[in-house]
């Protein structure tokens, strides 16, 4: 509510009501369409989407919830929230670091609940984001090597060809000279990051 009030004060014309309650399917569909139009407007204008207040209003509580779920190994609960958060962040082209962390969290959660094919699909998306952008590799450099080790294992579980993953692993290890034994587990790395962010 405080975030909504702040947005109303800062941006003239921001919707004045937060509606909660039990609604019919038609009402929910209409509201979803309205939200889609609103997000398209936000994306087009640009200014609003870059404010901390808007970020808090839109996805701060979801990020906090999934962080808590990850720390408590409640992977089933985290999966749908992470999927929705990723779609939202990606559609807004917002906070690349958060998108990469969200995808990595989603991949490990899907794997933990045995949804290996879904984990593979999102892992492929995550790898593509790293490989197509030097900026992303720089932003997510602490996650990249643990992600590759994770993917090597996941590809093996699914019987996928691991040659490309292993070539990327070899290339990524050269500057660090790390073996698998010295590379942090992706889940442990994500949990450490959450703990560090909580301290600041």
Residue ranges and their predicted role:
Residues 2-200:
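Intrinsically disordered, low-complexity regulatory regions
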């Amino acid at each position: 509510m405080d975030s909504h009030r702040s947005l109303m004060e800062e941006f003239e014309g921001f919707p004045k009501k937060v509606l909660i309650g039990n609604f019919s399917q038609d009402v929910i569909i209409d509201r979803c369409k309205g939200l889609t139009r609103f997000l398209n407007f936000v994306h087009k204008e640009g200014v609003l989407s870059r404010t901390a207040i808007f970020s808090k209003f839109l996805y701060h509580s979801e990020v906090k919830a999934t962080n808590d779920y990850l720390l408590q190994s409640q992977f089933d609960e985290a999966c749908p929230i992470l999927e929705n958060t990723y779609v939202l962040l990606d559609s807004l082209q917002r906070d690349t670091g958060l998108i990469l962390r969200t995808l990595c969290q989603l991949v490990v959660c899907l794997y933990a609940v045995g949804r290996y094919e879904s984990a593979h699909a999102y892992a492929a998306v995550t790898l593509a984001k790293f490989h197509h952008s030097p900026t992303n590799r720089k932003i997510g450099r602490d996650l990249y090597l643990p992600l590759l080790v994770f993917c090597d294992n996941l590809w093996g579980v699914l019987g996928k060809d691991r040659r490309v993953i292993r070539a990327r692993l070899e290339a990524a290890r050269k500057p660090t000279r790390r073996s698998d034994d010295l590379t942090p587990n992706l889940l442990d790395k994500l949990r450490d990051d959450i703990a560090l962010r909580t301290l600041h």
